[in-house]
Amino acid sequence: MFRTAALTAARVARPAVASAVRAGVARPAFVQAVPKVAAFQAVRFYSAGGHLKKDEVFSRIAQVLSGFDKVNDPKNITETAHFANDLGLDSLDTVEVVMAIEEEFSIEIPDKDADQIHSVDKAVEYILSQPDAN
């Protein structure tokens, strides 16, 4: 019984609702002023914040390297340490280190640049040259 009454009320109200929608519904001014934008718009904000210091970059890279199980001795992590010769990492480990550095500093290192990073000092030098690194 309730279902029948609800369906009858909906049929009776349908023309009135349709005409109100066609006529337009008044919207508040703040709703009308909002521009239509794409569903997702990536925006990167820059500020004049402090630039990374060399010792800070080195300590963060050393922390990343010390998290790798394959580093033969964490005491060997120095500013001039070579990933393969001094730390005992192979080429795949070096790729993983570069990826971890990308994640640590929120940057993307192109493959041609990543191929040149084989030591801590090269990694520090590269990070310092990137204005997006944080």
From Swiss-Prot:
Which GO terms are recorded in the biological process aspect for this UniProt protein? iron-sulfur cluster assembly; lipoate biosynthetic process
- As listed in the record, the transit peptide stretches over 1-46
**Annotated positions of the O-(pantetheine 4'-phosphoryl)serine modification:** S91
Which parts of the sequence belong to the Carrier domain?
A: 55-131
Taking the record's annotation, the residue ranges forming a coiled coil are none
Lipid metabolism among keywords: yes
Its pathway, per UniProt, is: Lipid metabolism; fatty acid biosynthesis
Question: Where primarily located?
Answer: mitochondrion
Query: Can you summarize the PTM annotation of this record?
Result: 4'-phosphopantetheine is transferred from CoA to a specific serine of apo-ACP by acpS. This modification is essential for activity because fatty acids are bound in thioester linkage to the sulfhydryl of the prosthetic group.
Localization: Mitochondrion
Q: Which GO terms describe its cellular component?
A: mitochondrial [2Fe-2S] assembly complex; mitochondrion
Provide the alphabetized UniProt keywords. Electron transport, Fatty acid biosynthesis, Fatty acid metabolism, Lipid biosynthesis, Lipid metabolism, Mitochondrion, Phosphopantetheine, Phosphoprotein, Respiratory chain, Transit peptide, Transport
What Gene Ontology molecular-function terms does this entry list? Answer: acyl binding; acyl carrier activity
Any Pfam family hit: PP-binding
Function comment: Carrier of the growing fatty acid chain in fatty acid biosynthesis. May be involved in the synthesis of very-long-chain fatty acids. Accessory and non-catalytic subunit of the mitochondrial membrane respiratory chain NADH dehydrogenase (Complex I), which functions in the transfer of electrons from NADH to the respiratory chain.
Spell out the PANTHER family in the cross-references. Answer: ACYL CARRIER PROTEIN, ACYL CARRIER PROTEIN, MITOCHONDRIAL
| Family, per entry | Belongs to the acyl carrier protein (ACP) family.
**Assembly and oligomerization:** Complex I is composed of about 30 different subunits.
Query: What protein is this chain from?
Result: Acyl carrier protein, mitochondrial
- Which organism's genome codes for this protein? Neurospora crassa (strain ATCC 24698 / 74-OR23-1A / CBS 708.71 / DSM 1257 / FGSC 987)
Q: What is the lineage of its organism?
A: Eukaryota, Fungi, Dikarya, Ascomycota, Pezizomycotina
